[in-house]
Curated annotation (Swiss-Prot):
This is Zinc finger protein squeeze. Residues 70-97, 131-142, 419-443 have a biased composition (Low complexity). InterPro entries: Zinc_finger, Znf_C2H2_sf, Znf_C2H2_type. The modification Phosphotyrosine is found at residues 479, 481. The keyword Metal-binding applies. Interacts with nab; which acts as a coactivator. Interacts with ap. Disruption phenotype: Death at larval stage. Larvae display a motility defect whereby the body wall musculature overcontract radially during the peristaltic wave typical of insect larval motility, apparent as a 'squeezing' of intestine. The gene is sqz.
Length: 535
């Protein structure tokens, strides 16, 4: 059985333990700000001394013996069970005192203590081993169950329920659970930033104060760091075969050339674009960027060469360079746009419209309605028939029967068919010759007021015995104009015509030229009669 030692001052161990526990509890009531500000002066130093004394106490009382027993348990020995049974009651005799002695709060050691003590908590923490030893006795777990555990479970028996990480100490597990729960009890009073661990807060405060407690112990190296990890990375430069180190960062190099290439990165000219491309003029800060850019130029040149070869091959095969797919697409677009009219002038548009109308119009008697030559012939025939009817009415001594007047009206309103066209022309010519002879015999010589171009109202009135057949002069003139208007309306086509057809129709004799044609015919007949009489 191991006896509890006395304190260094000769005070019994029980009083010493109770007094240390009271001091630790009083420290636990302090705020975070007091812990931070009182870190260097007084309270924390006493706490360090207490922790050091407890570590020495744990090392002196059964720690080495417990480690030896663990090694013996791993080795096959016939008396293994007897030793375990003998060791088990010894641990059960003093579990309360050991638990009380390790009830101190968790706080990491300072950098100086880490360098002096060289204490690795992940390797063999004394608190974990003593608590595991006491826990095995208190929980009543048999040594057989402990022997069944693997080496990994013995090294890190505390597993996190949220992730797959395991820890060697329960305090480390409690610190790790703060990450999952989002608990950050330590806060910086300068920038109000919060942390899950006190060590993280201490490292953060050094960024505000500029303290660098981790100094390099290599001869002739004056560097110091605020974090231990930076010191460890720096110490590798002295341990390896890289004597050439950069004064601006922690990197080391094996030769001087690589160091000289690395140094310009820390100068003021590191942002200057000194590497220029000879092809396009672009500039870059590093040569690697320029090389990547030149690779793009090479890829573009290869693509252009492939395109040129494809164009040459297509030209030799008489295939457009655009490809068959584009030609098919263009043909499809032309087919879609075929429903729309192409851009053309007014005359060409009117001519195309006239052709379309003539093709669509129904043909009656083998001749289309849009044939203006046939319409013009019909106009001339109607004019001749009207003149013949008027001259018969104007000739003195010629008696008009109702049948003749009806026949004359029928001639005016009737449209000649193409079959009797030649016969009617011959008859009209004969009638005109006969009328001219009769007019030359019965018509007096033209006076100064009677001219071939005088209007109809200025002509000589007929004899009284013909007034009953003719009616007043105004009625005869009105009847003539009505007949001309009816003929013009019948001659004009009812379908839509084009602008080109309208232009041609304006230059042809139509409804507006009927009256002028009558006067012209009368004048010619009078001149011919005068010539015959003179002969």
């Amino acid at each position: 059985m191991a006896e509890l030692p006395t304190a260094p001052n000769g005070v019994p161990s029980g009083d010493y333990l109770h007094r240390s526990i009271d001091q630790l509890r009083s420290l636990g009531h302090l705020t975070t700000a007091q812990l931070v500000h009182d870190y260097k002066p007084f309270n924390i130093s006493e706490f360090r001394q207490n922790v050091a004394e407890r570590l020495d106490y744990s090392l002196k009382n059964g720690l080495v013996q417990h480690q030896q027993q663990m090694v013996m348990e791993q080795q096959p020995h016939p008396d293994q069970q007897q030793q375990q049974h003998l060791h088990h009651p010894q641990q059960q005799q003093h579990p309360p005192q050991l638990k009380v002695s390790y009830s101190a709060p968790n706080s990491p050691p300072t950098p100086h203590e880490q360098q002096e003590q060289k204490y690795d908590p992940n390797r063999s923490p004394p608190r974990q081993q003593m608590s595991s030893a006491s826990g095995s006795g208190s929980n009543g777990s048999s040594p057989e169950e402990e022997s069944r555990r693997g080496d990994g479970d013995q090294a890190k028996p505390y597993k996190c329920g949220s992730c797959s990480k395991s820890f060697a100490n329960s305090s480390y597990l409690s610190q790790h659970t703060r990450i999952h729960l989002g608990i950050k009890p330590y806060r910086c009073e300068i920038c109000q930033r919060k942390f899950t661990q006190l060590s993280h807060l201490q490292q953060h405060i050094r960024t505000h104060t500029g303290d660098k407690p981790y100094k390099c112990r290599h001869a002739g190296c004056p560097k110091a760091f605020s974090q231990l990890s930076n010191l460890q990375s720096h110490s590798r430069c002295h341990q390896t075969d890289k004597p050439f180190k950069c004064n601006s960062c922690y990197k080391c190099f094996s030769d001087e050339m690589t160091l000289l290439e690395h140094i310009p990165k820390h100068k003021d000219s590191k942002h200057l674009k000194t590497h220029i491309c000879n092809l396009c003029g672009k500039s870059y800060t590093q040569e690697t960027y320029l090389q990547k850019h030149l690779q793009k130029h090479a890829e573009k040149a290869e693509k252009q060469q492939h395109r040129h070869t494809a164009q040459v091959a297509a030209h030799q095969q008489h295939v457009p360079a655009s490809g068959i797919g584009l030609n098919l697409q263009r043909q499809a677009m032309n087919d879609v746009n075929a429903a729309y009219w192409a851009k053309m002038g007014a005359d060409s548009a009117a001519a195309s419209l006239a052709e379309a109308i003539q093709q669509q119009l129904p043909q009656a008697g083998g001749q289309p309605y849009g044939n203006f030559a046939s319409l013009q012939q019909q106009h001339q025939q109607q004019q001749q028939e009207l003149l013949h009817h008027q001259r018969l009415a104007d000739t003195p001594g010629h008696s008009h029967s109702p049948h003749e007047e009806a026949a004359g009206e029928d001639l005016v309103l009737r449209q000649s068919t193409p079959q009797h066209h030649l016969q009617q022309q011959q008859q009209q010519q004969q009638q005109q010759q006969a009328q001219q002879q009769q007019q030359a015999q019965h018509q007096p010589s033209p006076g100064p007021g009677n001219s071939a171009f005088t209007p109809l109202s200025a002509t000589v009135a007929p004899p009284p015995h013909l007034q009953q057949h003719r009616g007043p002069p105004g009625s005869a003139a009105a009847y003539l104009y009505q007949q001309n208007a009816a003929a013009a309306a019948a001659a004009f086509p009812t379908q839509l015509i084009s602008l080109h057809q309208i232009r041609n129709y304006a230059h042809q004799p139509g409804a507006a030229g009927l009256i002028a044609g009558d006067h012209l015919a009368l004048g010619l007949s009078a001149v011919n009669a005068a010539k015959e009489k003179a002969q």
